[in-house]
Amino acid sequence: MTTSGVRVRIAPSPTGEPHVGTAYIALFNYLFAKKHGGEFILRIEDTDATRSTLEYEQKVLEALRWTGLTWSEGPDVGGPYGPYRQSERKPMYWPYAEELLEKGHAFRCFCTPERLEQMREAQRAAGKPPKYDGLCLHLKAEEVTTRVAAGEANVVRMKIPTEGSCDFHDGVYGDVSIPWDSVDMQVLIKADGMPTYHMANVIDDHLMKITHVARGEEWLASVPKHILLYRYFGWDQPTFMHLSLMRNADKSKLSKRKNPTSISYYSALGYLPEALMNFLGLFFIQIAEGEELLTMEELAAKFDPEALSKAGAIFDIQKLDWLNGRWLREKLTPEDFIARTLEWAMENSRLTEGLKLAQSRISKLGELPNLAGFLVSSDVGLTPASFAGLKSKPEEIHEILTTVAADLEKMPDWNVEAIEAELRDIAERTGKKLRVVTPPLFVAVSGSSRSLPLFDSMALLGRSVVRQRLKVAIAVVATMVGSGS
């Protein structure tokens, strides 16, 4: 690279709830920078205009700040290589696309989405992996000029060698060889003028003088495209390190369908950020049994990027619980414990707003734990008996809960008004009265049929906690359906 000193980055996309996988990759980069006396940079990759939102960007920033990580450059703190949002860098990318077109390293593609889908279907039917077939690769310059001038929609694709392989060294996987004929002619500039991840990623890493790219192993297959772009532009490429994905205990990819994956979920349930980062940091170091309790400074001191394994990092919630318990007992003084508990209870106004809702529903303060305790509880203790008092049969309860769980995932906003509107829409679509839809949800989110107002409660708990409680409720009710309860 053309810079002295190590520079690494974390580049999340603000398209959903901040994932623990983001914290995992961010921590590796942070520790790598600490180890080498380098710089840790935050960049927001919001080229997906249809899914990226400022609300999710704010959630990403809040979640990463909560973990205790700090960055020297980013959209919130600025820096010499900004802007640090890709959407604000859009004018920078087109000149590079023009350079690739002029040098013959890229071409314009006029294929419609319908034509591309037909192509993919035919390839799948033939048992071939879907990739662009090169229809527009050899269009004459005059035809391209005419169609562009006429305003015909097009994208810019990169050219790929047809023979040989891309050979490179990865900091985790060692020497890797990927045949060029397996690499797609990647879209670099979309029809709306925005760059794809691959184009923006390479250009931004170069302009921001990133020396080491550490990211998830799912990007390993994309390295040939990135290396090719570095070659086309005549730039030195960074060192690549592809980290093993975090996995469930059954070795499946960590996903919200099996385990809570949102950083906000762990914050809401009262996990200490130090404990979560301690837990994630153990994937990057080698220690003896009994030495697991480590601060960020101790993790940095023991961090050894040369000792990384290709084996999947198992996200064991039981181990996280054990580690968090040790932090609470061994790392906090009684005064710290009280202060952190109060800080957690007041987080996002969950407790204060909950108390306001409870005020008109109690006759004495001693009723508060039963009425509002679910707002600060990690588990509401659902059993088949929890749903036994409802008028709906288990089959209908199961249908309601699964429908609500699926629809809530699609909601762009999470607030009282949006939740109420969504549940009313579900009731209308399913032909049910709202008073039939809401009782199972009362039980699912609070553990009781008598609780605080449902829409307010769901808003206060947050999407990630509601998601997990619905998942547990669906599993409980499924046993009732199977047993004929």
From Swiss-Prot:
Binds 1 zinc ion per subunit. Pfam families: Anticodon_2 (PF19269), tRNA-synt_1c (PF00749). GO terms for cellular component: cytosol. The keyword Magnesium does not apply. A motif ('HIGH' region) lies at residues 12-22. GO terms for biological process: glutamyl-tRNA aminoacylation. Zn(2+) binds at residues 109, 111, 136, 138. Its EC number is 6.1.1.17. It catalyses: tRNA(Glu) + L-glutamate + ATP = L-glutamyl-tRNA(Glu) + AMP + diphosphate. It is found in: Cytoplasm. A motif ('KMSKS' region) lies at residues 253-257. InterPro entries: aa-tRNA-synth_I_cd-bd, aa-tRNA-synth_I_codon-bd_sub2, aa-tRNA-synth_I_CS, aa_tRNA-synth_I_cd-bd_sf, Glu-tRNA-ligase_bac/mito, Glu/Gln-tRNA-synth, Glu/Gln-tRNA-synth_Ib_cat-dom, GluQ/Sye. ATP binds at residue 256. Keywords: Aminoacyl-tRNA synthetase, ATP-binding, Cytoplasm, Ligase, Metal-binding, Nucleotide-binding, Protein biosynthesis, Zinc. GO terms for molecular function: ATP binding; glutamate-tRNA ligase activity; tRNA binding; zinc ion binding. HAMAP family: Glu_tRNA_synth_type1. Catalyzes the attachment of glutamate to tRNA(Glu) in a two-step reaction: glutamate is first activated by ATP to form Glu-AMP and then transferred to the acceptor end of tRNA(Glu). NCBIfam families: gltX_bact. Belongs to the class-I aminoacyl-tRNA synthetase family. Glutamate--tRNA ligase type 1 subfamily. Monomer. This is Glutamate--tRNA ligase. It comes from Agrobacterium fabrum (strain C58 / ATCC 33970) (Agrobacterium tumefaciens (strain C58)).
